[in-house]
C-alpha cells in the first residue's frame, strides 16, 4: 500500500542488537522490531531501518572477544558480519511477507552531489514499491577519512535526505539524562528538547558499549542534523521496539527533539552536514553578525585567519573569534588566496591577486548556519 503517514527512519545500535559479553544477536529484540516495522508499513508509513551490528556479528562468528581496531581487520570482520545480518533480517521479514533491500552507503555518497541525488532517488523508488530498506555503512570499502564513524550520523543524514517525518534512535537507555544513569544515581531525565535549547549534560559520560562506536554525544549530533531538516527525533530504549507506535502517536516516551520550525533547504543541509570541511576560516565579530543576524555573504575583509589547505569550491568551517563554529560554506578562493586577501577590502582584491575575482569569500547561497 502507498505510504500516507510519512517516513519513519529507525536506527538500532550494536548495544541494543547484540549481547555485550558475546557479541551474539539478541533475537528477543530483533523479532519484535521486525514485527513493529512491518505493522507500521501496513498502516501507511514508509519505513527505513538503519542497523548496526555487522562488526559485532562478524566478531562472534570468528570467535573474536573484542572489536578489532586495525582498519583492515575491522573491514574484513564487517564483511563477514554483514552477510549474516542481512540474511537474518531477510528471514524474519520474509516470514511476514515484507520485502526488504540492503543499502550500504559511504560518506562519499553524501559528499558527491550526484551520488547523493542518485541515492535519494533509489530510496524514493524502494519506498514507493513498499520495500523496507535496511541501511548500514559500507565498512568494507569505506576509507578512514570518508567514514561516518557511527550509524547515528548516518541515520540522521538518511532521514534528512528522504525528508523523513521521524527519526527513532534506539539505544541502551530509555531517554537522554543529565549524566550516565548507569553510574550516577542523581542523573535527571530530559524528556523534551527544542533547537537552540542549552543542555546541561555530560554527553561523554553516557559512553558506548565495547561492540559499538557511538555514544550519547553522537546521538545529540545526529539530532542536530535531523531536526535542521524538519525531522522529529526521539531517543528511546532499544530493548522496547514495541513502544515505537506509541511514540508516533505522541506519547511522552524517551527524549523528543523538536524539529526546526523552518527547515533548512536541502542544498544548505548538504553543505552543513553532508560535506567534510577541508579547513576553517576565523571571522571577526562584525562578520559573524553579518552572516548570522543579517543573512549576508562573507567578505574577505571579515576574515582574520585561515586554516587548512584547500582549493576554491571546498567546504570550510566558519568560526567566531573564540573558535566556536557558527556555520559552513563553499569558498570562492583557495586557502593560499584567502591568506593573501583576508582582512582586505573588496576593491583591493584585484591588485593583490592580479586578477578580477568575485567580491565574496563565501556567498550567502553557499553558506549554512549551525546552531
From Swiss-Prot:
Q: Which Pfam families match?
A: AA_kinase, PUA
Question: Could you tell me which residue ranges the PUA domain spans?
Answer: 278-356
Q: Which InterPro entries match?
A: AceGlu_kinase-like_sf, Asp/Glu/Uridylate_kinase, G5K_ProB, Glu/AcGlu_kinase, Glu_5kinase, Glu_5kinase/COase_Synthase, Glutamate_5-kinase_CS, PUA
What is the top-level taxon of the source organism? Bacteria
What functional role does this protein have?
Answer: Catalyzes the transfer of a phosphate group to glutamate to form L-glutamate 5-phosphate.
Q: Which example biological process does GO assign this protein?
A: L-proline biosynthetic process
Keywords of this protein's UniProt record, alphabetized?
Answer: Amino-acid biosynthesis, ATP-binding, Cytoplasm, Kinase, Nucleotide-binding, Proline biosynthesis, Transferase
Q: Which GO terms describe its molecular function?
A: ATP binding; glutamate 5-kinase activity; RNA binding
Q: Which cellular compartments is it found in?
A: Cytoplasm
Annotated residues that bind substrate are located at 52, 139, 151
Its name, as the record gives it, is Glutamate 5-kinase
Q: Which Gene3D superfamilies match?
A: Acetylglutamate kinase-like, PUA domain
The reaction(s) annotated as catalysed by this protein in its Swiss-Prot or TrEMBL entry are:
L-glutamate + ATP = L-glutamyl 5-phosphate + ADP
The metabolic or biological pathway listed in the UniProt record of this protein is: Amino-acid biosynthesis; L-proline biosynthesis; L-glutamate 5-semialdehyde from L-glutamate: step 1/2
The GO cellular component terms are:
cytosol
Transcription in keyword set = no
Residues annotated as binding ATP are 11, 171-172, 213-219
Q: Which family does it belong to?
A: Belongs to the glutamate 5-kinase family.
The catalytic activity of this protein is classed by the Enzyme Commission as 2.7.2.11
Q: Which organism was this protein described from?
A: Synechococcus sp. (strain JA-3-3Ab)
